[in-house]
Design a protein with these regions (language model features):
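Beta-solenoid repeat scaffold
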Residues: 1-16, 42-53
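Beta-strand-rich extracellular passenger or scaffold domains
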Residues: 12-16, 33-39, 297-300, 322
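Extended, compositionally simple hydrophobic/Ser/Thr-rich segments
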Residues: 76-77, 86-89, 96-102, 111-113, ...
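Well-ordered beta-strand segments characteristic of repetitive beta-sheet solenoids
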Residues: 3-7, 24-29, 76-80, 102-103, ...
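Leucine-rich solenoid repeat scaffolds
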Residues: 289, 293-299, 305-326
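Extracellular beta-strand/beta-solenoid scaffold signature
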Residues: 17-42, 59-68, 82-90, 94, ...
Length: 326
């Protein structure tokens, strides 16, 4: 029948002392989000597996928190995963996932990991996802649609707190370079996404191979506080992205770095240099059909940029409209 695990007000703790997930949720849902695609046993016995009010702590280098396989309508609420490898790991196929009010904290892998998964409809909200070495929220080798990331604190997701060698990563890392991978219909809104630089790192990184027939697109990045990384927002090979109403600050390279992308609308953002050792600036390279409207870019110091880079750069771009920028 239906499954629920409740730790009674957060008092329960499970220590995972071996490799693999502390909890593996395995269903048989092979359909979509359409009610008619569900088998009868999925609708009656597998719906709404719920994990609530429990802590998982890893005591093994390959211990994970949770792994989801072919589930339907999974819910995580009030869950903490710490000192594991991956926090919540979604593989193969899942539908209609809700993650809220969780602490995915100080893990050696990824906080919320969408890895080689076919997943439509997932909401990640009102959670702290921080100090995870290989990224806060990471998508790789996956087909994902309808991803909402809203109201979270996503920060310090790199090697520094782990005293480990750096690897390129991001607080939100979307990689669609693998064969067959695609990510569309994504909202990133009302989050704090920060806070320490790392080599090759970004706060938001979205990347695609240039020859893809389905580039990452239909993205909205709105109303976030984004700061303190090598690149704050770094897009490669994207098509159809709106970036609006964000405060984006303190970069080692660029606040906004967009490569080989089309149909990008950037409006109402504040770009600034928050601390003396960081810089500020926006760069487009190999882009077309770009609207850059109503944004401010401020260096703030009398000494100017550390490497004297321009605040706004266009390289090999066409059909760019820049209006009402300060």
């Amino acid at each position: 029948g239906p499954l629920s695990i409740d730790g009674s007000g957060g008092s329960a703790k499970l220590v995972m002392a071996g490799p693999g997930p502390a909890f593996r949720l395995v269903g048989t849902h092979g359909g979509t989000g359409d009610p008619g695609s569900r088998k009868s046993n999925v609708a009656s016995h597998q719906r709404l597996p719920t994990i609530r009010n429990i802590e998982v702590e890893g005591a093994h280098a390959e211990a994970d928190g949770f792994e989801l396989v072919e589930t339907m309508q999974s819910v995580f609420e009030g869950v903490m995963v710490t000192r594991c490898r991956h926090g919540i790991h979604l593989i193969k196929r899942n539908r209609n996932v809700l993650i809220s009010h969780c602490h995915i904290y100080f893990n050696t892998g990824v906080g919320v990991y969408l890895n080689a998964v076919n997943l439509h409809q997932i909401n990640i909200a009102i959670s702290h996802i921080s100090y995870n070495r290989l990224g806060g929220i990471r998508l790789e080798r996956s087909e994902v649609r309808n991803l909402q990331i809203t109201g979270n604190d996503i920060e310090y997701n790199n090697h520094k707190s782990h005293v480990a060698k750096p690897e390129p990563t991001a607080e939100i890392y979307i990689d669609t370079t693998a064969e067959g991978a695609s990510v569309n219909e994504v909202t990133i809104a009302s989050n704090t996404i920060q806070a320490t630089g790392s080599p090759g790192g970004a706060n938001i990184r979205i990347m695609e191979k240039p020859d893809s027939s389905r580039p990452p697109g239909l993205f909205a990045v709105s109303g976030n506080i984004i700061g303190s990384q090598e690149n704050n927002v770094h897009l490669t090979g994207c098509y159809g992205v709106a970036i609006s109403g964000n405060t984006i600050y303190s970069c080692e390279h660029r606040n906004l770095f967009i490569e080989d992308s089309r149909l990008i609308n950037i409006s109402g953002n504040t770009f600034r240099r928050h601390t003396p050792r960081y810089g500020t600036g926006v760069r487009f390279t190999g882009c077309s059909d770009i609207a850059f409207t109503g944004c401010s870019i401020l260096d703030e110091t009398a000494e100017s940029q550390p490497d004297l880079t321009a605040l706004l750069e266009l390289d090999r771009c066409k059909r760019i409209n820049i209006t009402a920028a300060v």
